[in-house]
Amino acid sequence: MAAGAASLAHAQTPAPEPAAPAAPAAPALSLAPVNAGASADELLRDADYALRLLDTGRYQDLWNDAAPFVKQRYNPQRFANDTRLSREAVGAIKSRGWAAVTRIIYSGAKDVPDGLYANVDYATTQASGKVVYEKISFRLENDGRWHLTGYLPRVAQGPIPGS
């Protein structure tokens, strides 16, 4: 992973993967019921749109629709620079397709506000033929829409929660 990709993971605070069962003092975390929040189709449309913006360098548009807590933590320039570096690390793309949609409810978590989050994972084939993975993360806000919380490309797919 390029240095820029690593810094974006900190800069945009993607919705973290659920951890193994924790001690009783840990924050509440659960997979959301299928009917909670918007449909998986809506999440896929939003994630596809976010990837189109990433692919065309429209980082300001991504910033404009980011979750409020992301905007409070990071200025637009840092967001754009980190996002650009992360996307550049992926390189030229031959194809990509979604691999998983996971919704997660966070309550009392240290780094993110309480709420419903979602990760959309993609398997991406680079022009070289190598497969990498891209995660687009969102938070369902009070306006009823999913707002971007992060973009995280990586070379290996971790476990998919609930599978």
Please annotate each region the language model reported.
Residues 4-10:
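N-terminal signal peptide c-region/cleavage motif recognized by signal peptidases
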Residues 38, 44-45, 60-115:
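Short solvent-exposed beta->alpha transition segments
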Residues 59-60, 145:
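Internal amphipathic alpha-helical segments of the cytochrome P450 catalytic fold
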Residues 101-163:
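Exposed beta-sheet edge and beta->alpha loop/turn motif
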